[in-house]
Swiss-Prot record:
This is Nucleoid-associated protein ML2330. PANTHER family: NUCLEOID-ASSOCIATED PROTEIN YBAB. It comes from Mycobacterium leprae (strain TN). Pfam families: YbaB_DNA_bd (PF02575). Homodimer. Keywords: Cytoplasm, DNA-binding.
Amino acid sequence: MQPGGDMSALLAQAQQMQQKLLETQQQLANAQVHGQGGGGLVEVVVKGSGEVVSVAIDPKVVDPGDIETLQDLIVGAMADASKQVTKLAQERLGALTSAMRPTAPPPTPPTYMAGT
């Protein structure tokens, strides 16, 4: 075994994991999720970075005398999209970070002394 061989392998593995993490973060930032409010009457599309891509509003909810309902539906759709981004991040990053966690070493068996 070469001196530092294990350390070199660990360093290379850490660099690979860091690269995968950066790639996953970039994918998440560009991923698009859909959020809905009012059972689909308002839909927003948001990137993982938080950028709002689009808002679609069903004409049925456009009532000049009741702007508050429309505002509530938009807020609900945005909140739903935010939850979708969080869920997507947990799914993608969770798998990656679980692969990075070190496994616990096996427990050492108890030692017995003769005559005790």
